[in-house]
Amino acid sequence: MNWNKGGPGTKRGFGFGGFAITPGKKEEPKLSQQSHSAFGTAGSSAAFAKSGPPQLPSFYKIGSKRANFDEENAYFEDEEEDNSNVDLPYIPAENSPTRQQFNSKSADSDSDDDPLEAFMAEVEDQAARDMKRLEDKDKEKKNAKGIRDDIEEEDDQEAYFRYMAENPTAGVVQEEEEDNLEYDSDGNPIAPSKKIIDPLPPIDHSEIEYPPFEKNFYDEHEEITSLTPQQVVELRHKLNLRVSGAAPPRPGSSFARFGFDEQLMHQIRKSEYTQPTPIQCQGVPVAMSGRDMIGIAKTGSGKTAAFIWPMLIHIMDQKELEPGDGPIAVIVCPTRELCQQIHSECKRFGKAYNLRSVAVYGGGSMWEQAKALQEGAEIVVCTPGRLIDHVKKKATNLQRVTYLVFDEADRMFDMGFEYQVRSIASHVRPDRQTLLFSATFRKKIEKLARDILIDPIRVVQGDIGEANEDVTQIVEIFPSGPSKWNWLTRRLVEFTSSGSVLLFVTKKANAEELANNLKQEDHNLGLLHGDMDQSERNKVISEFKKKGIPILVATDVAARGLDIPSIKTVINYDVARDIDTHTHRIGRTGRAGEKGVAYTLLTPKDSNFAGDLVRNLEGANQHVSKELLDLAMQNPWFRKSRFKGGKGKKPNIGGGGLGYRERPGLGSESSDRGNNNSVMSNYEAYKPSSGAMGDRLTAMKAAFQSQYKSHFVAASLNNQKTGSSAAGASGWTSAGSLNSVPTSSAQQNAANPDSPIAATAAAKGVPGFTSTGTLSSVPTFPSVGVQGYSNNSSANASAGNREGVGSAGSAPRGGSSGGGGGGIVRERYSDNRNSRHNEVPRRGEGGGRYNDVQHHGEGGGRYSDAYRHGEGRHGDSHRHAEGRHFTDTGGGNRNNVDGRNISEGRSNESRNGENRKDANSRDNKTDGFAVPEPPKRKKSRWDS
């Protein structure tokens, strides 16, 4: 900072503006022309600020903003001065060191303003700081002493627990999928859509040259050959076998007659087989003969061994496998468990010939199965889908297959494997040998199976789908579901003491719930259902076979093919979806002749299944409790189709319709079955209630066929009780109608003084007559002098009139015309023994349902007309008319007694008409046409 002494052209003071040292007139400092100081302006301003009123200095004209000293702007003076100080940049003088430094800094600032370089600089700084921090940590660890890393560091278990604590929802995806499962109307889970397995493409076998092979190895034993056809039939009947097909081989009754070699016989004896089962007796000769077969037998009957033993002989006759060859025998089954079980049987018997077997099923390792197939195996036990996958991936081929077996074929068709099964069969050479085995075989599925067989022999042991008689079935009925749980917990310890217990549940969710509840009761058990991993399923089944766990809770996935001899009790906690599944369920016990017990727990809502269960029990000669039968009777289809027990029903001899006592529940207030006092003791005269409704006959039949049509009161003077059968008082019938009004011949009843009808007829003058017309043909009662008349509304019998009707001018079948002397005709309304008119409750001597009854009219009984004094069923008892002779030559011709003519003095035998005539009968005359004018009668309630 320079000091200016003042002088011409220069101001006195420092370079920043100067101020007066001594009081007096202020002088403006004079700026040096040679140098420029930054303090000049500030100094000048400060000097002026300390002095009196502001004045405009002369040096303030260069490079500065002129200050506003107006009074109105005095308020903003300080702010503007501050702004002026801030806004004015510092510019050093040219060629000064400060200017040079300023220029160099501005150049540096221009380079630092690049944003990318600034960002990279920050990144590098942060990285440097991080590296330094890591180095510090490493130094701290190196300096630390006495610390074990294996304790301080996190091991696998701690890492797992930490992960589960941080992720509590890990592994819950499966449960969510289970909740999304859909169920059908029966409550069975609908399997989620899996990978669709396309069938194998078609193949043209004509382009492939197959080597010849032999498939008939059966040399019939001489003892079997010596049997006569009758003895063969008796042997099959003894074994409960039904064989159909072209020239089936004869059955063998022992292993020695099968022609097995010593190696196989040794293995069979080692497996503790003593005698072949019935299906083996017939199935082994058929399979060894090279014939295609359909084998149907109950569960546990030895079907597996029946096709494994001939298969081994079939394989040993062919040349050994070469590298790249496929199997010789293929066994296809529906489930993984059955696949593994058959595979173990094949290994057991196949080791006698060093034959290799491979199990190929879904859920197993694809790579391991493919490797085993490529190494070569004579026997492949598989499920359809996985075999197709391996064939498509060239892991194996079916060119050498000559022995093809479908076990549980109906189950595969039911599961939707029909196209896969057909494609597998179409890929095997056409001249193969094919065998189908199952416990049940429906007609539709059997037709599908016959399409892949050639001239098959069908072997049925027992009834198709019947239950095993070695299994004792016990049905328990409970009022509700919780009652089943109480019963199970109370009896389960008892069941486990006798052997392993298999509990079947329909739904997978119910199986898990039941298993959890039993575990809370401290029961050791296993769980098996379709959604479990294959390794878990294998582990559970293995433990159950080894008796490691005494109880297994399973769905129907374990219902087929599971062969565990230790199972002594099967409990159907939930009923099966159909009777075939029930048959397979209970077949898990009682295997190979062993005895077992199967419990089925029912509730009232299971009435639909109860009907099938009743028939299943009856087919297996099992006891059917009354409670179960009552529950089954709640099902309408079972109640309608159930056979009717009790005594057989007698035919309806009288006309159907009016004249029958009303059935209880169909209009009558009470049943008179227990009361032997007839209401006919009260009536005063005949009151037949037939109205003029001939044109409405069809409507009357439909509307009133099962209801009471008319009431009659006794025409007796002394109110005597009338019986239910006496031949003298025959009833008249309005043929074709619903009415049956009893009448009587006066002379006929007069001949029998013991009959109360005689007195009634004598008093009232009632002859017998026949009306074969409509309801309008109403009988009236002329004097006794009139012998009888017959009124035919039609030329012959009407639609309801049966053969042999004694009508005037028409001769009945087997006899002369019934015109004239008291022709009494009975017509049956219908020859159907089961018609609703026949099912009328009656009361008679026996008091039973089918005994004779007294109706509201003389002779209104079904089989007789007055007192019955004998044992004749159709009113053919001893009669008190003179010289009467009748013989029923029809025997069982009970429905053809409609047109019965009974006349005095005629004796005739007719098989159908049963015309009865007295010895005093007159010849056929035309006086039957002389119908007297009927007197007026009281109006009936049926008259329109």
Swiss-Prot record:
**A matching Pfam family:** Helicase_C
EC class (word) = hydrolase
EC number(s) of the enzyme?
A: 3.6.4.13
Residues recorded as binding ATP, renumbered to this chain, are A297, K298, T299, G300, S301, G302, K303, T304
Q: Where is the composition biased (Polar residues)?
A: 738-752
For bias type Basic and acidic residues, the affected ranges are 131-149, 825-887, 901-926
Q: Provide the alphabetized UniProt keywords.
A: ATP-binding, Coiled coil, Cytoplasm, Helicase, Hydrolase, Nucleotide-binding, Nucleus, RNA-binding
Quote the catalytic activity from the record.
Answer: ATP + H2O = ADP + phosphate + H(+)
PROSITE patterns, alphabetized: DEAD_ATP_HELICASE, HELICASE_ATP_BIND_1, HELICASE_CTER, Q_MOTIF
What are the Helicase C-terminal domain coordinates in residue numbering? 487-632
Short motif (DEAD box): ranges: 407-410
Q: Which processes are annotated in GO (biological process)?
A: protein localization; regulation of apoptotic process; U2-type prespliceosome assembly
Q: Where is the composition biased (Low complexity)?
A: 35-52, 723-737, 794-814
**Amino acid composition bias (Gly residues), ranges on this chain:** 1-18, 815-824
- UniProt GO cellular component terms: cytoplasm; nucleus; U2-type prespliceosome
List the GO molecular function terms: ATP binding; ATP hydrolysis activity; RNA binding; RNA helicase activity
Coiled-coil annotation reads 120-157
Source domain of life is Eukaryota
Functional description taken from the UniProt entry: ATP-dependent RNA helicase that binds to partially double-stranded RNAs (dsRNAs) in order to unwind RNA secondary structures. Unwinding is promoted in the presence of single-strand binding proteins. Also mediates RNA duplex formation thereby displacing the single-strand RNA binding protein. ATP and ADP modulate its activity: ATP binding and hydrolysis by DDX42 triggers RNA strand separation, whereas the ADP-bound form of the protein triggers annealing of complementary RNA strands.
Q: How does it assemble?
A: Transient component of the SF3B subcomplex of the 17S U2 SnRNP complex.
Q: What is this protein called?
A: ATP-dependent RNA helicase DDX42
Q: Which organism is it from?
A: Gallus gallus
